[in-house]
Amino acid sequence: MSSSIKKLKKDTKDTDKTPSKKIYQETHNSEDSEDSEDSDNENNTITMFNSTQNFYKYINLNKIKSSNYHSEISDNSIRPYFENLEKHLVEYINKATYVIGCIAWLTNDNIISSLQQKKGIKIIVNKEEFLNPNMEIAKKNYYCTLRSKYQSLPNMFTSKCYCCSDSITSCKKFNKIFGSISMSENNNSSVLTCGIVNSLPKMHHKFLIFFDENLNPVGVWTGSYNLSKTSNFSLENALYITSQIVIAEYIKEFLAVYKHSENFNWKSGTLYGKLKNPVY
């Protein structure tokens, strides 16, 4: 254990659980650890976490850049983003009618609020303990509220279609895009989950696909950016792509993950569905 970490532990003990005023560097327990109950600090430069009486302070790494030094890209089919990613993503969500995608974590309140205004969504997240209400961690107020927000999101696959005023799954255009969607009581929620609980192999995708009211795919958002509050403090990147060829490939990937997805309040911590050639 390094001397700096030893000193930190002494500081926290001597101050009777009062956080040390020093900012220190230490790897968090999980590389992609997301928002917790204590993560709603609106300070733009520092967010504080309390974990097993060790106090973590995260500085906003975006502050290392004094200005946006990136050039405007003239290629209209792809746009890179490095700053204000939440703002740009919310703008794309607001313009869309339907949104689908695979996102490792969905905990950003502003993004969830934007998704609530859509005609319909279908988003797959990584399978986590807090999604199952029977797990101990899931009983925390923060996670109870988060699951309640998931339940309030509009389900694309059970909505009515704009173009034919019928069930969207009866729409010819929908079926041309998504093929024969298999729906059951196991995958009928707006937010689904895929993966294995407490396992390092994760459903680690980060992409959203946007559709207009006529079910025309208009763009895909992808990159390193997690849809979480803490990601706004990290150095992240994202691409917005309007190439129909590229969008079609992301739809294929969504459907592949969908086949092994279930409602977010999962019943089994193992992977849903059977693999033809499982590798261990």
From Swiss-Prot:
Coiled coil: none annotated. Residues 1-45 are annotated as: Disordered. Residues 1-10 have a biased composition (Basic residues). It holds the Pfam family PLDc_2. InterPro entries: PLD-like_dom (IPR025202). Residues 32-41 have a biased composition (Acidic residues). Residues 11-31 have a biased composition (Basic and acidic residues). Gene3D superfamilies: Endonuclease Chain A. This is Uncharacterized protein L381. It comes from Acanthamoeba polyphaga mimivirus (APMV).
